């Protein structure tokens, strides 16, 4: 199955998400919703390598842009907006795909946003963090 692109509403704005189906069903393995890091976007080399690695194991991945990247910016959105964007993409995944199991996460800042959603009680079957920042940028503790 070919990748499927969606426009996802985030408040009054929209962003792009791409679902790349795996070869195994979500009853066997979860779908992974993967957010990019601060310096990247959903189509950068590290994100595409992540998607390939999951596909080698038959796992479907949804990748998306945060709003600032969708607009071509370089300064990340506020953490509440990053979390809202992630939640909106997950809601769209649930509407479109009805996954049996769903894991949220991402690279660096994207993983941080997903972990903060999970800490707030956001419903997901798992949390996967890649290159997770242990502290905010510019601070060592």
Regions found by a protein language model. Name each.
Residues 1-2:
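Basic/polar N-terminal segments that are highly enriched at the extreme N-terminus
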Residues 86-141:
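Primarily recognizes the serine-hydrolase "nucleophile elbow" in alpha/beta-hydrolase
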Residues 5-101:
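Serine-hydrolase catalytic machinery in alpha/beta-hydrolase-like enzymes
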